[in-house]
């Protein structure tokens, strides 16, 4: 799940469709003209991040005129991005060269033959000095299909003036929240539960916290069991506790962040970008903003949260695959990965960036991030992941309506049907 990319900064709208259509037209013209005869590398995905224009400019300068990277707009939510990718790649569109892909798409796109395997020197270069978990997100059937650019895990953010000692478990957090509410203080627990990919991340977090999984190791069958029932029980408790936002079932990352920024939340389960975003949105609150590992279900457990992030993949239909690879490597090199981390809050996949003094200063939660990354778990790795994700977000929405045992039973059947490709639109 990338922050504010794979799990969305905003909802899809007709405006986005209009912008996308115009962007596609501009891209088509640029690809044909080549900007005066040169090679154009069309980048889709991640091109609109804060400060990213200077990364593109840097890499274009380094290319020395051999090619020019052109960033193209996509919808800012993961589902909208995937929809555009699928439609254009299925049509063998050669106007897409470099794809900024959510980590959950690797298996699907590789199995469909839409992205190129990286072998030999390219594989060595793409994995050198790269954290292990991000490399795994770019891998399918032991083959590498992407350049890991960013990675991501959620943290617990909290108000230090309200919560001197952060909770370690969900029960502790709910108890603290209730005490704050009773005292007439800000108390809300912020988390994403709208019907979209960010909600699936939280579902996966809770199932994993209970020691369960959603599907088996090869994603061929659901593993919905008593651990899933326990996770759904906790999710229902949260949704009906009176301790979350009244709009929890419509909340994506921006809404969860806004509640924290406005002082309504005492606790917020969100991605690392929160700190850099808060420095811009509400500098006065930054000193009161604390961070801690994601809560566990049982005291003493190690937090195991869902892995997010973005990889650069090269389209099978690109006419310039070598230049596209070079462009991708440049945009995620140590200098530019650090720039994205400082400007946009993008957690780098490159291990070397974590040792840079500038990064350490900007990311006081560095050690928590590394520990969580070490123990992070993926969402179901499957060519039909989108089907599974759709089932999870629809069957369990809204969370307040969950009936743990009955919902688990329905989920089991629906996931099996999704795996078999029944009744789900691609």
Predicted regions and their residues:
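Conserved C-terminal helix/tail region of periplasmic/extracytoplasmic solute-binding proteins
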Residues: 2-3, 371-426
